[in-house]
UniProtKB/Swiss-Prot annotation:
Boundaries of every ABC transmembrane type-1 domain copy: 65-279
Protein name (record): Probable ABC transporter permease protein BAB2_0490
Top-rank taxon: Bacteria
GO biological process assignments: transmembrane transport
SUPFAM superfamilies in alphabetical order: MetI-like
């Protein structure tokens, strides 16, 4: 009997901590989202879901929702595509490999805010490094306002998002590649397999669990990413680069709509929970089959 109850006693402190740190704030968030709230954060009467209705009736929220989906898919997908070949190269035995790994990982150690500040300066339309380089190469005659135009601001932010996500994703894939036995590659080489065949038949299938981990973690990380969008453009021009997390910030701290901001938080939480559960189930079934 004691052996059966011991595991529950061991995990009890963690459950209590999770209840205090996670579950209670979510319950309080739901309470705020379903009530009218004044600018001082005081709850008024129950509004029967009016905050959620108001959100879906506004074009700003719907545009931010769609843009968040584009932002997440593009950044996560782009980081995966770049990180796999980078990890494969860094996993090879060559002179200076340790230095190359450190260089790749360094951006991960820099805060997102500092990275966003650097890129905001580099993409400045008047004195930015990118325009100066393009002028020097003779590729442009007039300055390009990278962050002042909706057509270029959001794509550049996606590019920055990919670049800052690659180091973490590469680290995950390096861990996966190091677990693949070298004997498999040696045997396939003796049988005349090309590098592409080795990747398709050995590397990628054995790397799939790590790909799944990277997709789930990066989706959560990128979906909630605030500094890149906010520091570079604050959602400008005309809210054309807003995603859900920056839209939430504006609702709460610029417009004082704490009820609607809380509703956005709950919607974001629900989206991530549904995605994570569905993706883990699909990936688990595919591995079992």
């Amino acid at each position: 009997m004691q052996n059966r109850t011991l595991p529950y006693f061991l995990i009890l402190p963690s459950l209590l901590l999770a209840a205090v740190v996670i579950f209670w704030p979510v319950v309080h968030l739901f309470e705020i989202a379903t009530h009218d709230v004044n600018r001082f954060g005081q709850l008024r009467e129950f509004n029967d879901g009016a905050n959620f209705t108001a959100l879906f009736a506004t074009a700003e929220f719907m545009n931010a929702l769609w843009r968040t989906a584009v932002w997440t898919v593009a950044v996560v997908g782009g980081a995966l595509v770049l990180s796999i070949p980078v990890a494969i190269i860094l996993n090879m035995d060559f002179y200076g490999r340790s230095v190359a790994r450190v260089i790749i990982m360094l951006p991960w150690a820099v805060s997102l805010t500092m990275t966003a500040i650097f890129w905001r300066w580099a993409l400045n339309g008047e004195s930015g490094m990118l325009n100066s380089a393009l002028h020097g190469l003779g590729l442009i005659d007039t300055n390009i306002q990278w962050l002042a135009s909706a057509a270029t601001a959001f794509p550049m932010q996606i590019l920055v998002g990919i670049l800052v996500t690659v180091p973490f994703t590469t680290t995950i894939f390096l861990g996966g590649l190091s677990s693949i036995p070298d004997d498999l590659y040696e045997a396939s080489s003796l049988e005349g397999a090309s590098l592409w065949q080795q990747f398709r038949e050995i590397t990628f299938p054995l790397l799939k669990p790590f790909v799944n981990i990277a997709i789930v973690l990066n989706t959560i990380y990128v979906f909630n990413s605030f500094p890149i969008i906010w520091v570079m453009t604050q959602g400008r021009p005309a809210n054309s680069t807003d995603i859900l997390v920056t839209h939430l910030y504006k609702l709460a701290f610029r417009l004082g709509k704490f009820g609607e901001a809380s509703a956005v938080s709950l919607i974001m939480l629900a989206i991530l929970l549904v995605f994570t559960v569905i993706y883990i189930r699909i990936s688990t079934r595919s591995e079992q089959s």
